[in-house]
Swiss-Prot record:
GO BP terms, alphabetized: riboflavin biosynthetic process
EC number of the protein: 3.5.4.25
Catalytic residues in the record: D431, R433
HAMAP family registered for this protein in UniProt: RibA, RibBA
GO cellular component assignments: chloroplast
Inactive DHBP synthase: region residues: 44-302
Taxonomic placement: Eukaryota, Viridiplantae, Streptophyta, Embryophyta, Tracheophyta
Protein name: Monofunctional riboflavin biosynthesis protein RIBA 3, chloroplastic
Keyword Zinc assigned: yes
Residues bound to GTP: R353, V354, H355, S356, E357, Q374, E397, G398, R399, T419, T454, K459
Originating species: Arabidopsis thaliana
Keyword Magnesium: no
Amino acid sequence: MMDSALYHPRIFFAHSFINGLYSSPRFANTCWRLVSRSSWEIKASENSDRNVFDENPVRKTDGSLFDSASFETVDAEITPETDDFFVSDAEGDPDCPTQGYSSIELALQALRKGKFVIVVDDETGDVEGNLIMAATLTSPKDIAFLIKNGSGIVSVGMKKENLERLSLTLMSPEMEDEDSSAPTFTITVDAKSGTSTGVSASDRAMTVLALSSLDAKPDDFRRPGHVFPLKYRDGGVLRRAGHTEASVDLMILAGLRPLSVLSAILDQEDGSMASLPYMKKLATEHDIPIVSLTDLIRYRRKRDKLVERITVSRLPTKWGLFQAYCYRSKLDGTENIALVKGNVGNGEDILVRVHSECLTGDIFGSARCDCGNQLDLAMELIEKEGRGVVVYLRGHEGRGIGLGHKLRAYNLQDEGHDTVQANVELGLSIDSREYGIGAQMLRDIGVRTMRLMTNNPAKFTGLKGYGLAVVGRVPVVTPITKENRRYMETKRKKMGHIYISDNNDQPLA
């Protein structure tokens, strides 16, 4: 039988003969099995005349079938489905705040009233939080509060056109590089009118208001000064996940002019960067909404149009005829593809696979993962259904870490790390993929409700809340091999992927 740590010995697979891969008639003609809790049913073909298997399957050294290089796909005659992915409806809603944080809507309400908001950039690692408010609504009292609880540096987030209008050049021209992650400070300024030394809360408030004025001119300011203009990068937090971009984005979303006042929050006891508990205490004491930058990114991704359709072309494949839709990201120019089978029609109950790019698995047939097998199976099942969509997302290599880092992680796995430990050892995210682009592609194609082919709860939740409803899940069940067994076991245990238990008939959560 199959060398597998995840599947019970009695579970069979009816293997599709895709890419010339070998299989076994004996293995394929075993009996069917019903998995009760999730209503999955995978059934072997009862048609012994069906010639889809290699007559000379490769054997292991001990004579058994399926050596470590075998990674066939499953032929599911009855599409396995489940209605539940063990997550709440709110979990995948981009408008639902991270636990312990305020909603973006609450923050926008506060900003419209001239109140402060705290923006935190990383709720899991080394955090940095900024107090922000609308520059156009700033008072001396607000600046005094900002100086007391912040770093003492009062900054103003501004768009490029406003900086150019006031002839505010960057302190370091090399920071003009759009790929730089560092904040882009301009020459500091003080307002000439209505100020003395420029250092008091009143003087700095006057400078902030002068920078916000539509009538302001370059000659209205002394250089250097005590207020630090910051250049906002076009695209906002969708281009650079920084506090400058977050603060200006929030002003735009609140319907205010795109100018913000901000300062990093310090611990008043020792002068260090404030911890998350410290910032939450400050927020509670002063009734200030505190929001996660991650939540703001999700909020914007739901509302902004992130892709544009470039072209549609007929694409014959080895599975059948599809229509290829090419989309270009408005954020970074990356081109993604969706393969559409049949007529989407009213967009209801569409079989969908959102597949993350995996060069090694999809193209070169790597046995380290199950990616290529999953893509093959998705194409086959959609062809059989006669109606469905495969979205292929680039930039997801190695769960978002990139090809080079993925290969470095492979070396660590060969030394004994699992796929999660390897990413952590490299100082990288376990899974940094984001599915908003894919969701918008599906919406443009016309999909409204879908049966999602995935084993990954993060993918399920990542597609919810974009005007799409996931009405069912189709597990993508592919064989386990000697090479990918530990990888898939780690995904099940540490990342919540759902497979079939090796001990019982229940789906694994």
